[in-house]
């Protein structure tokens, strides 16, 4: 990738040259350090369980991008991309490096982000905690040897000091916690939080800037490939079935969360998976369960005195996680890349019960739904939610997008055209009524519909437009009841369906206003009932 290599500051150089900065330790060496430092506990599965302390998830209100003249006009500033000035950043950066210099040991990893060498980012990760260093080794791409690692000249450096607490009045932060990205200094500075996912998502945010600036698409999606080389992408927010549907026995996993799309095809940005572990069972999700073995990091799970993990126990958080290298999964492609996609699936869990279980999208509709990033919050999942609420996350990944969302949508539209990609909207939510009245669409039906779409079986199918959303719905599909294909037929009262559909359309349109007049054409040609 055409990114200048990081110009090492004297303080960074000094840190890296210290004998106590332990470079490229093996998994076993890190296990010993984790246990000696009381950073985690060994489980009977062979995995290490670590606590992230006070913060069991990301801290989006504490994430900043340094405002620097060379790129400040490119950033989509706002609540997600908060500005911090360069002098404030450099002062805090210096304090963190001084703090780390006093530590008995540091842990250093060199690796890569991006499995396609044409667009690969070279990384150095400096960690205060040994388990964070193993997390980094699991989530990023490991060099083949220590010798290769020692020759890496990083394009970006992560400096992670979770036990360093910022003073907001002095350091210009909002709290003791900070995640600061500087594109000029090629650095992600993290402090005040032990949540390891900040490193993973920090690099994803960096790639979401660097790749599109070179007209390469970056995507928050999972991807798999069939025996004939046919590639499918799955976009979807939490609870839509992205992990479940992309883990198909007859297809190989490219990656489960972050991908790029360049002139060569699809490539995984990561070298590992960061799977949700709450309520995990071997019966329901064998692929993930079996990946939890020696080398895996578990976060915030409950472990008894015998080392047995209770995946159903949410005493610490609902956001329990398992971080493991992708080679812990059997059914994968290595290196994690493949050809251009044939099919894109947008997953949504519509708790209003009005979207069809599957619909084929035009390019404009695809761009509209990509920008919208819709799913539903359900009653009981968040405090105070008693009725279904729409949830919109731009491009299915709003917290990680430094650029104007229209940039990502334009790139997607160009690639859909160029590679003649079929795009489908798949509703894994409700039918026959909203949540509490209707019923969840059967996973059996959803799997079948997705399988048919991916295998190209719907290319020559007969479609009809639904009256409210203007979406193209298959008139029939073997093994799927006709009554659910067109959602109005699944409701006992069609007038109630129309009223509920109108309500959801209004919410979509209200949300879409934030994208401004430059997307007026997408709204007119890709919006509803067009």
Curated annotation (Swiss-Prot):
Recorded family membership: Belongs to the phosphoenolpyruvate carboxykinase (ATP) family.
Binding locations of Mn(2+): 201, 220, 257
GO cellular component terms, A-Z: cytosol
Pfam families: PEPCK_ATP (PF01293)
GO molecular function, one term: ATP binding
Cofactor: Mn(2+)
Protein name, UniProt field: Phosphoenolpyruvate carboxykinase (ATP)
Alphabetical GO biological process terms: gluconeogenesis
Cofactor note: Binds 1 Mn(2+) ion per subunit.
Annotated catalysed reactions: oxaloacetate + ATP = phosphoenolpyruvate + ADP + CO2
Principal subcellular localisation of the protein: cytoplasm
SUPFAM superfamilies: PEP carboxykinase N-terminal domain, PEP carboxykinase-like
Protein task: Involved in the gluconeogenesis. Catalyzes the conversion of oxaloacetate (OAA) to phosphoenolpyruvate (PEP) through direct phosphoryl transfer between the nucleoside triphosphate and OAA.
């Amino acid at each position: 990738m055409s990114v200048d290599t990081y110009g090492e500051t004297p303080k960074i150089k000094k840190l890296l040259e210290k004998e106590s900065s332990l470079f490229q330790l093996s998994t076993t060496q890190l296990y010993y350090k984790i246990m000696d430092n009381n950073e985690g506990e060994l489980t009977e599965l062979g995995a290490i369980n670590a606590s992230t302390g006070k913060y069991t998830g990301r801290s989006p209100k504490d994430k900043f991008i340094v405002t620097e003249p060379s790129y400040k006009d490119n950033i989509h500033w706002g609540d997600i991309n908060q500005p911090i000035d360069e002098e404030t950043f450099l002062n805090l950066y210096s304090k963190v490096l001084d703090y780390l210099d006093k530590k008995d040991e540091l842990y250093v990893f060199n690796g890569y982000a991006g499995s396609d060498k044409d667009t690969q980012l070279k990384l150095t990760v400096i960690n205060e905690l040994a388990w964070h260093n193993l997390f980094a080794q699991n989530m990023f791409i490991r060099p083949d040897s220590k010798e290769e690692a020692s020759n890496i000249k990083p394009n970006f450096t992560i400096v992670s000091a979770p036990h360093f607490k910022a003073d907001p009045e002095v350091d210009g932060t909002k709290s003791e916690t900070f995640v600061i990205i500087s594109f000029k200094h090629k650095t992600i500075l993290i402090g005040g939080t032990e949540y390891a996912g900040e490193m993973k998502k920090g690099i994803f945010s960096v790639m979401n800037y660097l790749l599109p600036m070179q007209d390469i698409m970056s995507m928050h999606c999972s991807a798999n490939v069939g025996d004939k080389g046919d590639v499918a992408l799955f976009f979807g927010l939490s609870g839509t079935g992205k992990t479940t549907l992309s883990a198909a026995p007859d297809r190989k996993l490219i990656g489960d969360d972050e991908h790029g799309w360049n002139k060569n095809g699809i490539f995984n940005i990561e070298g590992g998976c960061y799977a949700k572990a709450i309520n995990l069972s071997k019966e329901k999700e064998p692929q993930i369960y079996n990946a939890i073995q020696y080398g895996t990091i578990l976060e915030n799970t409950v472990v008894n005195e015998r080392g047995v993990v209770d995946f159903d126990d949410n005493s610490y958080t609902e956001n329990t996680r398992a971080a493991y290298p992708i080679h812990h999964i059997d059914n994968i492609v290595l290196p994690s890349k493949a050809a251009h996609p044939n099919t894109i699936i947008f997953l949504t869990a519509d708790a209003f019960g009005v979207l069809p279980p599957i619909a084929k999208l035009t390019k404009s509709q695809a761009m509209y739904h990509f920008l919208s990033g819709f799913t539903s919050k359900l009653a009981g999942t968040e405090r105070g939610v008693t009725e279904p609420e729409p949830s919109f996350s731009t491009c299915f990944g709003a917290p990680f997008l430094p650029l104007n969302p229209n940039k990502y949508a334009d790139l997607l539209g160009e690639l859909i055209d160029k590679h003649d990609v079929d795009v489908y909207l798949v509703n894994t939510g409700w039918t026959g009524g909203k949540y509490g009245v209707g019923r969840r669409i059967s996973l059996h039906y959803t799997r079948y519909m997705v399988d048919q779409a991916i295998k190209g079986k719907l290319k020559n199918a007969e479609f009809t437009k639904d009256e409210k959303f203007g979406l193209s719905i298959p008139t029939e599909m073997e093994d799927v009841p006709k009554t659910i294909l067109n959602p109005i037929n699944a409701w006992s009262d069609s007038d109630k369906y129309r009223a509920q559909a109108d309500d959801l359309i209004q919410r979509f349109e209200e949300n879409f206003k934030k994208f401004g007049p430059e997307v007026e054409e997408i709204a007119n040609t890709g919006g509803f009932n067009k």
